Design a protein with these regions (language model features):
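Compositionally biased linear targeting/interaction segments
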Residues: 2-3, 17-284
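N-terminal leader/signal peptides at the extreme start of proteins
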Residues: 1-15
Length: 284
């Protein structure tokens, strides 16, 4: 009588059993190899990510050094304009590359040094909120985001406000770069603020171009604009009264940096710099 099991299983040592064992070994090796590949791939990707992060950090530091060399040279004009600050700086360093742009901080209202009357004129604010900011125990604020901790300053108000305020500008506003919203906060009526911005645009009607009009000092605003603008007595008095709140140049600059590692975009950074110092450093 034949053994029925013999029809289903090959005897040990037979060619069939060797083939089955070989297949099982091959399957196990394939699974093991796939696992090793996943582990190795994950480690390689992690290593590349760490390397990219480290390299991008040092690229950003190089960008800040480059910006300091450009912005704080001895023969630089005593004034800053939207055009002079508009250049995009693009440099390769080793296997990486950085690209940065610059904004002066003096185009904004300093909420640490400005009185409530000026702060109240900023978008979204009023006298009550301005007093809350001025009287806050957090003042002087270390970062503009701390304004969100002041009672009454909602996220919506902050979003509409953040581009017009600073905690480092030194208290004076750059007449060459400040937007109309900042100029009106100083007490300049809207039509006059718009006229100043329009005058700065030059012949082509665009700000940030080579034909922009430049105020080399705040005291020449009236004399420079009289050829194109008819001032009322009250407007002249307003400009004369706020001259001490204005500047034509800047001491602090915000550097916005993009880095590229292995020809791929890596980390982005933002640094606020003064001469010889980095006041803020953050990833974007």
């Amino acid at each position: 009588m034949k053994n029925s099991a013999g029809s289903l299983w090959c005897r040990a040592g037979s060619p069939g059993s060797v083939l089955i064992a070989a297949i099982w070994i091959l399957v196990m090796l394939t699974i093991f190899g796939a696992g090793l590949y996943r582990i190795a791939s994950a480690r390689i990707l992690m290593s590349q990510a760490v390397e990219s992060r480290i390299v991008s950090y040092y690229l950003a530091k190089s960008a800040v050094n480059d910006a300091e060399a450009v912005l704080f040279v001895n023969d630089k004009p005593a004034y800053d304009t939207l055009f002079s600050l508009s250049e995009e700086h693009d440099k390769s360093v080793g296997g990486g590359r950085f690209v940065y742009t610059v904004e002066d901080e003096e185009r904004r209202i300093d909420v640490n040094q400005s009185p409530a009357e000026i702060i109240a004129g900023l978008p979204g604010l009023n006298s009550e909120l301005a007093q809350a900011l001025v009287n806050s125990s957090l003042r002087p604020f270390a970062a503009k985001e701390e304004l969100l901790l002041v009672e009454g300053i909602s996220g919506e108000i902050f979003e509409g406000l953040k581009d017009f305020v600073s905690v480092y500008s030194g208290g004076k506003v750059n007449i060459n770069t400040a937007p109309a919203e900042v100029l009106t906060a100083l007490g300049i009526e809207k039509s006059l603020a718009a006229a100043i911005v329009e005058f700065r645009k030059g012949a082509d009607g665009k700000e940030g171009t080579s034909d922009d009009e430049v105020f080399e000092s705040p005291s020449e605003v009236l004399s420079r604009m009289r050829s194109k603008v008819s001032f009322m007595t009250a407007q002249e008095q307003t400009l004369a009264a706020i001259t001490d709140l204005l500047t034509a140049g800047s001491r602090y600059y915000r550097v916005k940096i993009k880095t590229y590692v292995f020809n791929k975009e890596a980390m982005n950074y933002e640094a606020l710099i003064g001469k010889g110092s980095v006041l803020e450093w953050r990833e974007r």
